[in-house]
């Protein structure tokens, strides 16, 4: 144990390996590309006739969306356990702004590999994913690489893992997308929709938005401790993330209002 400018209870005996991080990131990006390329084969051969029939009737654009969901789902399942472990250990050792261990290295490696894949997909077909998702991919990769740079490390490293816990909403979102294609009238569609709404609003809005503000405040409190360039990048990305989560939360709440709470009856038309 040691202390840096008043930051106590931090483990400094862990050696972060740059070469291992870069190798792992490339390895996982290759894995995600392989899954993406083989997604159609996996879907048509390992998920039963009902799923196969639904998938084969999709347009090429819809098939690409399905394949992207497969990769997104696998990334969420892979990274979430390491995010939770990292978050618990970061809180345990006293400062979520400054900590590093094997779990955090895995979080950075898996998510960097995913964001490399994601950014290339966005570059190849930007109209398919949309501007907000392109910004999301750029932010994800740039923040991962920047916190892994040697100067000032491990400042902000734990926060990457904590913020990626919001990927928990990705799982029901993708399940909703899969079920909508296979059988939109299934009771599981409504269950997955409800799970998505709850996990998204709780993780990204109710907790996420105040947490973004806290992170900026915490960064300012440590202004003299961490490298200025990393602090500026961190604050900028927190601001963009706050905007994106606010925007997505607004769209979701608006959709819920229009669907369930719209005060104007749908049958009311052309009254005299």
Swiss-Prot record:
Domain TLC: residue ranges: 61-261
BP-aspect Gene Ontology terms: lipid homeostasis
Transmembrane regions listed in the UniProt entry: 16-36, 71-91, 103-123, 128-148, 155-175, 196-216, 233-253
A GO cellular-component term linked to this record: endoplasmic reticulum
Lineage top rank: taxon: Eukaryota
SMART domains (alphabetical): TLC
This protein's UniProt keywords: Membrane, Transmembrane, Transmembrane helix
Membrane topology type: Multi-pass membrane protein
Compartments it resides in: Membrane
PANTHER family, sorted: CT120 PROTEIN, TLC DOMAIN-CONTAINING PROTEIN 4 C
Protein family according to the UniProt entry: Belongs to the TLCD4 family.
Protein name: TLC domain-containing protein 4 C
Source taxonomy: Eukaryota, Amoebozoa, Evosea, Eumycetozoa, Dictyostelia
UniProt gene name: tlcd4c
């Amino acid at each position: 144990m040691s202390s840096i400018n008043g930051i106590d209870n931090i483990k400094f005996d862990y050696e972060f390996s740059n070469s291992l991080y870069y190798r792992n990131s490339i390895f996982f990006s290759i894995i995600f590309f392989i899954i993406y390329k083989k997604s159609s084969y996996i879907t048509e051969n390992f998920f039963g006739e009902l799923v196969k029939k639904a998938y084969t009737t999709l347009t090429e654009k819809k098939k690409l969306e399905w394949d992207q969901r497969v990769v997104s789902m696998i990334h969420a399942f892979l990274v979430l356990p390491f995010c939770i472990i990292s978050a618990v250990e970061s809180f345990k050792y006293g400062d979520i702004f400054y900590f590093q261990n094997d779990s955090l290295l895995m979080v950075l490696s898996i998510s960097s590999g995913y964001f490399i894949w994601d950014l290339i997909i966005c570059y190849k077909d930007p109209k398919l994913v949309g501007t907000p998702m392109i910004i999301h991919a750029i932010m994800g990769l740039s923040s991962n690489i920047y916190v892994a740079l040697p100067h000032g490390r491990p400042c902000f490293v734990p926060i990457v893992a904590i913020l990626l816990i919001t990927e928990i909403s990705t799982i029901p979102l993708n399940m909703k997308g899969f079920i909508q294609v296979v059988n939109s009238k299934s009771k599981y569609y409504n269950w997955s929709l409800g799970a998505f709404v709850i996990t998204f609003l709780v993780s990204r809005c109710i907790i996420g938005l105040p947490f973004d503000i806290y992170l900026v405040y915490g960064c300012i409190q440590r202004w003299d401790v961490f490298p200025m360039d990393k602090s500026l990048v961190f604050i900028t990305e927190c601001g963009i993330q706050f905007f994106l989560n606010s925007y997505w939360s607004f769209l979701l709440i608006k959709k819920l209002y229009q669907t369930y709470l719209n005060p104007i009856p749908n049958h009311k038309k052309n009254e005299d």
